[in-house]
């Protein structure tokens, strides 16, 4: 995200980011060599820098690639070494083990409100204290656009709070430091929050451009605003917030006013069926409202249509050039095609096309190239290289001086649930395919697949005849990791790392080598690892390639959001839901049934498609919660292979094994707690249920 580079370039920093609802300390944005806040809006350059600081809160987000955050590390997608629970800023174990406490929660609550305050401070200064130079330098329409960007960010930060904490206080203006505690805001009803955020996004979209290019990419657009509104409304229509909230006795201390004024334009038709005159002290509605799904469906359709037209978006991989990008990046040589068991012969056109699709899918999430128009919004993660290394194999090769080993941490370990819920090559789950004789029987999954070749004989049947996304993003014993990861000599162009997950001499378990960095399940992930990533022979330096931005909103989400809404509305919309699901599966090279399934089956298919397509992109934490299925997915035991044994033979390694960590679910985890201090100092605030 080029914005962050611009923050440094303009030399404008945040020096007193302490805004929160308790102390009401204000934000002070002061250029380091200037006198005070008014200088922040003195010129066009300084004001633009001030605006960029409003985006800095995105770096405080639960980044999809931040594996130790609650957002990722607590889900059933992958497991981490238990020692990583002690890392600075690690909260994954609190949510995975049901240990989260209001005495010491993560700091996202204060961070988001801090940046909401930052945005309102920007709005106040631009409106009330623009410098004379700024007034002369402003380009036509620029002021309105910058204000719209701040309003977009205010809406986003409120949504980021809402999806994690449930009903929240809505901040509508800059809160001065002198505000007495009796005037602090309490939580608002969940639906009120949703309708206010949707309204703010509508207003912001009116003055935002549909696209941005070059150094402006990553700043707010109307395409982003419409896509975010669609997501907000889909979340609100989902079971947890639409009749299945488990804590009916959880009430507010203050009344939430009515919200019918927020229903304008296309939403006006829902004013009476969704809006209210007054919410009283209720925090979450206890009844189901089908109109929420209809409203969400309409917003999702409009967001998708706008993205495809005004937004200029398309699914990556739908043009021929997408399939051959690896040739531009790595060279026009078959050696760079990925290894896929059973598809070794590149002279067979079907094999070649399959492998090119695998490479395309790796590039889709690892980089943003000028022709990749799928990424609607992306984030440059903090310390990207170290987070990429967290998923790369350890102990790859000895460096040039033979005194140390190059490699990553091997730690991001996909669970067996993950491995078993990517599709087969025929587009069905392995268990379903096994029941019809179209895949190895479940009893044979951990047996050798009979693959010939150098170090390939230990590939198991579960890892053969799988879909392209499986080979793009997963890695397994006997398979390849990366494309040119090993540069084992000064003249070497690089080659893949052939995984040996069973032995300490390979990439397996060995606490003497590292007491905290090891693989937990016997599987690894290559998602986000650029095909050009490489460890260099001399010194073992890691070159990650182009690893940014990390997806926040992709066009594929708009298709699947719409499909989910259509499937839940049902009726004639089921066929449309299947068609939108098919768009994503076609790009992935996965066949789709032509017969419209029954409603519950189709919803299940869409849910699993989200699991695969958005694996490790930060959706799973929120999806399982909004579906009200926490116990089903996060309360069950988590499994891998018998990988945490040193130098284990094939037969003992390939055994279904329960991960030895205390994973637990409690329904209180549907909401995150806020700090007790917030409740003690704010007489209007109620703590999340169960804390």
Task: Map each language-model feature to its residues.
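Short coil/linker segments at helix-helix boundaries
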Residues: 133, 140, 167-187, 240-295
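Structural register within alpha-helical repeat arrays
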Residues: 147, 154, 229, 236, ...
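Conserved, well-structured interaction surfaces
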Residues: 43-61, 66, 83-165, 180-217, ...
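Short coil/turn linking the two alpha-helices of tandem helical-hairpin repeats
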Residues: 162-163, 167-169, 232-244, 568-571
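Bacterial Sec-dependent N-terminal signal peptides
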Residues: 1-33
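Membrane-proximal, proline-rich intrinsically disordered regions
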Residues: 24-71, 460-464, 474, 675-691
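Long, intrinsically disordered, low-complexity segments
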Residues: 24, 112-115, 196, 256-291, ...
């Amino acid at each position: 995200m080029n914005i962050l580079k611009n923050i440094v370039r303009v030399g404008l920093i945040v020096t007193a980011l302490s805004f929160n609802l308790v102390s009401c300390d204000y934000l002070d944005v002061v250029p380091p060599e200037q006198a005070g806040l008014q200088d922040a809006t003195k010129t066009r350059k300084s004001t633009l820098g001030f605006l960029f600081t409003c985006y800095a809160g995105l770096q405080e987000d639960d980044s999809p690639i931040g594996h130790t955050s609650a957002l990722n590390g607590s889900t059933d997608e992958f497991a981490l070494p238990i020692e990583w629970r002690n890392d600075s800023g690690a909260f994954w174990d609190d949510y995975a083990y049901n240990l989260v406490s209001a005495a010491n929660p993560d700091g996202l609550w204060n961070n988001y409100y801090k940046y909401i305050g930052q945005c309102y401070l920007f709005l106040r200064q631009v409106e009330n204290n623009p410098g004379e130079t700024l007034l002369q330098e402003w380009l036509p329409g620029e002021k309105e656009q910058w204000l719209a960007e701040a309003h977009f960010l205010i809406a986003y930060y409120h949504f980021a709070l809402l999806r994690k904490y449930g009903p929240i206080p809505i901040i509508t203006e800059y809160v001065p430091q002198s505000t007495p505690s009796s005037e602090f805001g309490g939580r608002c009803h969940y639906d009120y929050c949703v309708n206010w955020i949707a309204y703010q996004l509508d207003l912001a979209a009116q003055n935002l451009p549909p696209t941005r290019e070059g150094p402006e990419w990553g700043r707010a657009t109307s395409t982003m605003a419409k896509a975010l509104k669609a997501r907000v409304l889909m979340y609100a229509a989902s079971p947890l917030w639409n009749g299945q909230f488990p804590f009916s006795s959880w009430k507010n201390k203050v009344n939430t006013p009515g919200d019918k004024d927020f229903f304008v334009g296309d939403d006006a038709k829902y004013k009476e069926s969704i809006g209210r005159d007054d919410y009283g002290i209720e925090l979450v509605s206890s009844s189901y409202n089908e109109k929420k799904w209809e409203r969400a469906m309409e917003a999702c359709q409009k967001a998708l249509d706008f993205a495809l037209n005004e937004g200029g978006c398309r699914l990556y991989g739908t043009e021929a050039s997408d399939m051959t990008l690896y040739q531009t990046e790595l060279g026009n040589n078959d050696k760079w095609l990925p290894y896929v068991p059973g598809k070794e012969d590149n002279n067979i056109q079907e094999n070649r096309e399959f492998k090119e699709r695998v490479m395309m899918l790796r590039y889709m999430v690892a980089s943003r190239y000028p022709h990749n128009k799928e990424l609607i919004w992306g984030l440059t993660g903090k310390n990207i290289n170290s987070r990429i290394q967290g998923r790369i194999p350890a102990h790859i090769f000895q460096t040039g001086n033979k005194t140390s080993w190059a490699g990553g941490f091997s730690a991001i370990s996909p669970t067996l649930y993950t491995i078993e819920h990517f599709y087969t090559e025929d587009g069905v789950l392995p268990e379903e395919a096994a029941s019809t004789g179209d895949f190895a029987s479940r009893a044979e999954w951990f047996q050798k697949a009979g693959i010939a070749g150098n170090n390939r004989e230990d590939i198991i049947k579960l890892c053969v005849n799988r879909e392209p996304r499986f080979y793009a993003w997963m890695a397994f014993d006997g398979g390849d990791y990366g494309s040119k990861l090993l540069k084992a000599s000064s003249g070497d162009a690089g080659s893949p790392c052939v995984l040996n997950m069973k032995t300490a001499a390979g990439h397996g378990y060995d606490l003497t080598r590292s007491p905290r960095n090891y693989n937990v399940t016997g599987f690894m992930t290559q998602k986000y690892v650029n095909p050009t990533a490489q460890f260099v022979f001399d010194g073992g330096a890691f070159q990650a390639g182009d690893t940014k931005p990390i997806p926040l909103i992709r066009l594929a989400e708009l298709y699947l959001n719409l499909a989910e809404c259509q499937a839940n509305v049902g009726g004639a919309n089921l066929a449309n839901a299947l068609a939108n699901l098919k768009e994503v599966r076609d790009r992935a090279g996965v066949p789709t049934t032509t017969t419209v399934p029954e409603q519950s089956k189709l919803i299940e298919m869409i849910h699993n498609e989200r699991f695969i397509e958005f694996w490790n992109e930060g959706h799973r934490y929120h999806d399982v919660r909004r579906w009200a299925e926490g116990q089903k997915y996060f309360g069950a035991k988590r499994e891998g292979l018998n990988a945490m044994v040193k130098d284990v033979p094939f037969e003992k390694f390939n055994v279904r094994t329960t991960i030895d960590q205390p994973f637990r679910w409690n329904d209180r985890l549907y909401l995150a707690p806020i700090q007790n201090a917030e409740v003690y100092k704010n007489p209007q605030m109620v703590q999340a249920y169960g804390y």
